[in-house]
């Protein structure tokens, strides 16, 4: 697999919530990433895809909740989020095009 394709597989989607919008004011962007992605891969992918400088990456595993569907208990999938801190003067606007 080429490097560009690997970068697109690393960043699944941006997280657009009230909390992530507040973090964007601090030069931080939140993305959903695969459970197998590590911090180095995430930083490399963000730098390559968005042409910005990354200073730090923090990751969070969000465990899926147990929910009931038609009376049968089921479980939502686990997810992993990455909070990417950008260098001073760099920014990413993930809300354009929505």
From Swiss-Prot:
The keyword Ribonucleoprotein applies. One of its GO terms (molecular function) is structural constituent of ribosome. InterPro entries: Nucleotide-bd_a/b_plait_sf, Ribosomal_uL23-like, Ribosomal_uL23/eL15/eS24_sf, Ribosomal_uL23_CS. The keyword Ribosomal protein applies. GO terms for biological process: translation. Keywords: Ribonucleoprotein, Ribosomal protein, RNA-binding, rRNA-binding. PROSITE patterns: RIBOSOMAL_L23 (PS00050). Pfam families: Ribosomal_L23. GO terms for cellular component: ribonucleoprotein complex; ribosome. One of the early assembly proteins it binds 23S rRNA. One of the proteins that surrounds the polypeptide exit tunnel on the outside of the ribosome. Forms the main docking site for trigger factor binding to the ribosome. Part of the 50S ribosomal subunit. Contacts protein L29, and trigger factor when it is bound to the ribosome. Belongs to the universal ribosomal protein uL23 family. HAMAP family: Ribosomal_uL23_B. This is Large ribosomal subunit protein uL23. It comes from Maricaulis maris (strain MCS10).
